Amino acid sequence: NYSIELSRKNWASYTSYTKSYFGDIHMGKVRNHGYEDWGLVNYYSQNINGEFFENQSVNNNPNLQRNTAYKQKDLIQKFNFKVSKTARLILNFQFSESSNINRFDKLSEKNEEGKLKFAEWYYGPQKRSFISSKLSFQSKKLFDRADIIFAYQKIDESRNKRKFGSNLLNIQDENLNVFSVNSDFFKRIDRQKSIAYGLELTNNQLNSDGFESLVNSENLNK
């Protein structure tokens, strides 16, 4: 993680960048309940990173949940401006992106023959972009304090799956755009009474496309 903070009399800035790597999950070896084979992962799929394996592979460490590793990076940028004696503006920018994220539960499913059902089942890189502006100001008439937020968020992700014995990858692409306006107002009447009220408007635009892609099986691994 890398972060930088800068500030002056009327403004401040915060920048943060985080890069994370999460490895495959390890299970404990002690099974006090008496079921020694419970949860063991004896077979797994090596069909990742463009590789094509026709059959399931033997897991030389059954306590290791293979294909659960993934990477992620996050970027945050915030600005805080003092617009006047009674007003402040905050700008917020965020971006995050992951690698492919495998569905371990789906990759562990078995068919009627007791073999692994899916060669691939993963979420494609999840991308999230977010931008917002928040204006906070004071007044002595209709309210004591007000916060107005304009925000936009974009999320892209996909679901990808392919069964063993097939070279067709089923892909479901999803794109979501979210627009929102949020306003909050606060007014104190006396020491014991106060009023809080607000308004929120949102608009969600979702686009979903499904299609199939032919997986290159020229370099077939048995």
Question: Model-predicted segments: where are they?
Answer:
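Extracytoplasmic loops and strand-loop junctions of Gram-negative outer membrane beta-barrel proteins
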Residues: N1, S57-N63, K73, E113-E120, ...
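Surface-exposed beta-strand edges and their flanking turn/coil or helix-capping segments
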Residues: Y2, T18-K19, M27-V30, R103-K106, ...
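Transmembrane beta-barrel wall of Gram-negative outer-membrane proteins
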Residues: Y2-F22, M27-N100, K127-S129
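Flexible, surface-exposed loop regions and adjacent strand-edge segments
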Residues: V30-W38, S45, D105-L116, R162-I171, ...
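Short hydrophobic/aromatic-rich motifs at helix boundaries and adjacent loops
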Residues: S45-E51, R103-D105, Y152-E157, Q205-N207
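Face-selective signature of the C-terminal outer-membrane beta-barrel domain
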Residues: K82-S96, G124-K222
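Residues that scaffold the ATP/ADP-binding catalytic core of kinase and kinase-like folds
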Residues: I101, Y122
